[in-house]
């Protein structure tokens, strides 16, 4: 039976009732002692609460940074697409204005379209490569963060265990 009780007398009552009902045996007294130690040490409670709050803030900050990065990348891609559309329209206008020979213009148009298709294909390949690299870096960063957080938590638990063992 595990509980995190803010009122030690209520916890004691819960443990006693559980003992009477046969749910808790020898561990009941240990749990009462642990709860009482936690209740007596408000400084320790405050440190644990602060650590939890700092961890939550850090996670929120990491998430906002990632969202900001994604938004900037989308805006850059949109601006690049708009620039390409403007170039295309300007080229079309010049072709219509300078159209002397119909066949020559059609050939130039086809050549330009082929060039644009190749550029778009190359750009798409490059964007996919960059996206894959970005996703991999994000995964590595998140994995490293989780490993560090786990190690910090483990060392904090060991430290708390040693401090409680001295009592």
UniProtKB/Swiss-Prot annotation:
RLWRNWE repeats lie at residues 34-40, 61-67, 86-92, 107-113, 134-140. Residues 1-22 form the signal peptide. It is found in: Secreted. Expressed by the venom gland. Residues 23-94, 112-118, 139-167 form a propeptide. Keywords: Cleavage on pair of basic residues, Pyrrolidone carboxylic acid, Repeat, Secreted, Signal, Toxin. Its main location: secreted. The modification Pyrrolidone carboxylic acid is found at residues 95, 119. GO terms for molecular function: toxin activity. It comes from the Eukaryota. One of its GO terms (cellular component) is extracellular region. Residues 147-167 are annotated as: Disordered. Transmembrane segments: none annotated. Belongs to the scoloptoxin-08 family. This is U-scoloptoxin(08)-Er5a. The lineage of its organism: Eukaryota, Metazoa, Ecdysozoa, Arthropoda, Myriapoda.
